[in-house]
Amino acid sequence: MAALSLLDLARALVDIDSTTGREAEACAYLAAYLRGRGFHVTEQPVSGGRTNVVALVDPKPTVVLSTHIDCVPPFFPSSVEHGLLYGRGACDAKGALAAQVTAAERLRESGEAKVGLLFVVGEE
């Protein structure tokens, strides 16, 4: 799977309704994207059929980047105006999530493979 730009990944995530309790589609998308980019992904079961997403390159990371997948209602999709991304979760925390994925990929490409990602549900 080809890498998405930071903006495209953030926008793809913002366009998925992941208000608290409805994170399944966003988690599935994120897990598939990360697998397609060569990460070893574990979907960690949580209550109510929900999952956290753990993605590793090395089984013993020295750094783990983490944030949450869920956001508060109501859902509304993304828009980009004057170079700025708007939409539910763009700032809290899907933009940060996309930035963490992008950072992990760049670290891996530079030879620093000991980075992990942990994205959790139910923070809101």
Feature locations, PLM:
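Acidic/His- and Gly-rich active-site-bordering loop/insert found
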Residues: 1-90, 108-112
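Acidic/histidine-rich catalytic neighborhood of metal-dependent amide-processing enzymes
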Residues: 94, 98-124
